[in-house]
């Protein structure tokens, strides 16, 4: 995996998934040069999708993309059997890979993580990207575990690293050749400078062209040009997590007239003060005109 992979929102309309809006968003992203899309992840509100909706969203994304870019579907769960079922379904309908979040809440040991990811890797053939996000799962995939999984299973090829500790990123990249993608927009350039390959991005939902340019510059070693784009977009990056993701990005998309719609409870609309800050930031960077 290399480049920009937007973690796409799941647009809703009147309480149901807005598939027409989903197609519109995907076309916009592809037209602006992204490497692939990641449906039904954190940004896609996967915890509030029913299992049937989860599968149908993946199916529709594969259909809409139609081979133009990669589709890496979020199929993780804190139940190994459920993650396996989602992953096998995604493989059967033609995804290019799956993204597996660390099991959350039940907090397995590192040995449990090895067995969890290993069982899924042994049961599917498509590439697997691990997803490490300790702030949400209360559990870190340790560098030694990442190295073990990469070396033991040929289809574990990448990791979305949302642990902001760059020492961890350094340890991982120093120990094995797994593709590391930043899971935080604001850490994209530091991670690429250490040997990472790109980003699973939230902000790319609204600024794909700029983010693709930034990552392309960075991967080409042109960090001065990459930094210009980073600092231009930084006011928005900061606000993407002022409230729980995907509240800010869906709010921004609604402001920009993009298909996004409402949030599903327990997520709710953005506080008015934060909404005003977001509107001002979108104006400042020239996205809202």
From Swiss-Prot:
Some GO term, biological process aspect, for this entry: which one?
A: lysine biosynthetic process via diaminopimelate
What the entry lists under Gene3D superfamilies is as follows: Aldolase class I
Gene Ontology MF term list: 2-dehydro-3-deoxy-phosphogluconate aldolase activity; 4-hydroxy-tetrahydrodipicolinate synthase activity
Q: In which pathway does it act?
A: Amino-acid biosynthesis; L-lysine biosynthesis via DAP pathway; (S)-tetrahydrodipicolinate from L-aspartate: step 3/4
Q: Which residues bind pyruvate?
A: 43, 200
Q: Which CDD domains match?
A: DHDPS
**One GO cellular component term:** cytoplasm
Q: Which reaction does it catalyse?
A: L-aspartate 4-semialdehyde + pyruvate = (2S,4S)-4-hydroxy-2,3,4,5-tetrahydrodipicolinate + H2O + H(+)
**Site entry: Part of a proton relay during catalysis:** 42, 105
List localization entries. Cytoplasm
- Give the positions the UniProt entry annotates as the active site: 131 (proton donor/acceptor), 160 (schiff-base intermediate with substrate)
Tell me the keywords, alphabetical order. Amino-acid biosynthesis, Cytoplasm, Diaminopimelate biosynthesis, Lyase, Lysine biosynthesis, Schiff base
EC number(s) on file: 4.3.3.7
Q: Which InterPro entries match?
A: Aldolase_TIM, DapA, DapA-like, Schiff_base-form_aldolases_AS, Schiff_base-form_aldolases_CS
Purpose of the protein: Catalyzes the condensation of (S)-aspartate-beta-semialdehyde [(S)-ASA] and pyruvate to 4-hydroxy-tetrahydrodipicolinate (HTPA).
PANTHER family for this protein: 4-HYDROXY-2-OXOGLUTARATE ALDOLASE, MITOCHONDRIAL, DIHYDRODIPICOLINATE SYNTHASE
Q: Which family does it belong to?
A: Belongs to the DapA family.
Give the multimer and partner information: Homotetramer; dimer of dimers.
Instruction: Name it.
Output: 4-hydroxy-tetrahydrodipicolinate synthase
Q: Which species does the entry assign this protein to?
A: Methanococcus maripaludis (strain C5 / ATCC BAA-1333)
What's the name of its gene? dapA
């Amino acid at each position: 995996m290399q480049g920009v992979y937007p973690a796409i929102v799941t647009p809703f309309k009147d309480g149901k998934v807005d598939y027409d809006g989903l197609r519109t968003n995907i076309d916009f992203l592809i037209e602006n040069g992204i490497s692939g899309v990641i449906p039904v992840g954190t940004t896609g509100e996967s915890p509030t999708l029913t299992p049937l909706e989860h599968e149908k969203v993946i199916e529709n994304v594969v259909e809409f993309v139609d081979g133009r870019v990669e589709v890496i579907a979020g199929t993780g769960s804190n139940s190994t059997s459920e993650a396996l079922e989602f992953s096998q379904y995604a493989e059967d309908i033609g995804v290019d890979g799956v993204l597996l979040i660390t099991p959350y809440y039940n907090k397995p040991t590192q040995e449990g993580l090895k067995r969890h990811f290993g069982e899924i890797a042994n049961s599917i053939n498509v590439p697997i990207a691990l997803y490490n996000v300790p702030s949400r799962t209360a559990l870190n995939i340790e560098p030694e575990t990442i190295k073990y999984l990469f070396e033991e299973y040929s289809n574990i090829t990448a990791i979305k690293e949302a642990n902001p500790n760059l020492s961890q990123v350094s340890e991982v990249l120093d120990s094995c050749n797994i593709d590391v993608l930043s899971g935080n927009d604001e850490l994209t350039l530091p991670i690429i400078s250490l040997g990472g390959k790109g980003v699973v991005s939230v902000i790319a939902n609204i600024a794909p062209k700029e983010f693709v340019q930034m990552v392309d510059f960075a991967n080409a070693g042109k960090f001065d040009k990459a930094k210009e784009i980073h600092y231009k977009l930084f006011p928005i990056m900061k606000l993407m997590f002022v409230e729980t993701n995907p509240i800010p990005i869906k709010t921004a998309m609604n402001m920009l007239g993009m298909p996004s719609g409402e949030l599903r409870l327990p997520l709710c609309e953005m506080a008015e003060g934060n909404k005003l800050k977001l509107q001002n930031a979108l104006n400042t960077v020239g996205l809202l005109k």
